[in-house]
């Protein structure tokens, strides 16, 4: 199927271009943990959580709506970027005083408040760049958004690492400046590349902006509520536990978030515009793409969970400091299964957004916001960071159950459910084999776990012959193809040269 092959190739190439982003993010996180004690590391994570929530509020669903609208009716959206920029600028100006007021009311120290302010300014630049990115992704143009995201993460990492290494006891405010510089470079790259584009109308049309915001309201409300219950645990932990516990949980959660990069590339970057385009036609091709995406992410997600659960102590010891961050390992083990369900949830949720299910998804998010906060109120006082981690995983399980009930009956197939179950079973089998082997070092556990997992995947026939043939074709093992050229700045379907 041509669209499936194109989608798989786009995922591969966009994913390859984001390896540098992953490396830069991990390196910056490791250096932060090495040069900051757990309490200050936790404060920085808290500031980043506020910035993430602000970004979602400023976006307010416009990225999702713009990508979907452009994918479905691309020739009618010349002024959509200007309208999106106006919406985001106004929402940022409205939200900033409330953000600073909350910081002062909660009694944060001056350094943390300044860091939150700097990250808020960085968020404005990220949101401006995101407006352009949403438009380009809707056109299935991936080169420029990938370069922009890489520039943001790499520049922020380089500047941040330099500050941490060269400045004795750097302030959180100074570290936050690294993110601001990266955001400015990223946004500047996008707007410079689009200068002189006649296909884009830059004049401000307030009525168009109001209409766009009105259409985005259900999506924006969903994203705000969803971001709330995925970041509120860190805020609650900061108010209910010692600073060290906040740092331990933040360290585990940063690894958890970094591991979602694959999901962000596969689904948010590549698949969502495809889902939106396919939603206008027959459901068969959409169903096939969803099935293949869920199978791929289930197999990959189970492998990540396997390594995190088995190797948590070793990972924490290498990336952080065993003495200062030892409790992080158990929190990471409790968070890890949530990745498996998060990968699956992302596919179903984005498909439902493409089909226009945002109002039903908002109801789901509101219910889980109440459940998540209630569960954290019970778990954090008794289990601290471990309780917050367990609640995160249980939330993902509940979301998957709700989403599968919400999706149309013909959208998810029994074959996909069997593949997901087999991937989970293969991870359990591999984990038991590694434990029984007595291996206790990363050098021994990682290859043994992956080998055992691969054998179990094959033995359980998790991947069928047709899938293996598709993978072989994807990597060029099939019949030779004539190389294709990719015109810069044009819609790309055959070949391809992703926020705090």
Question: Predicted segment positions?
Answer:
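Membrane-interface helix-loop junctions in multi-pass transport and translocation proteins
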Residues: 33-41, 110-113, 117, 139-147, ...
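Transmembrane alpha-helical segments of multi-pass transport proteins
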Residues: 23, 368-371, 416-470, 487-489, ...
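N-terminal membrane topogenesis motif
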Residues: 1-24, 75-78, 82, 111-112, ...
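Interhelical loop/hinge segments that connect adjacent transmembrane helices in multipass membrane
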Residues: 1-7, 172-178, 188-230, 270, ...
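Signature of the first transmembrane helix
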Residues: 3-63, 96, 100-103, 122, ...
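Interfacial segments at transmembrane-helix termini and the short loops linking adjacent helices
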Residues: 103-119, 308-340
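Hydrophobic transmembrane helix module of multi-pass membrane transport proteins
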Residues: 88-225, 230-231
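Helix-loop junctions and terminal segments of transmembrane helices
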Residues: 25, 58-75, 138, 252, ...
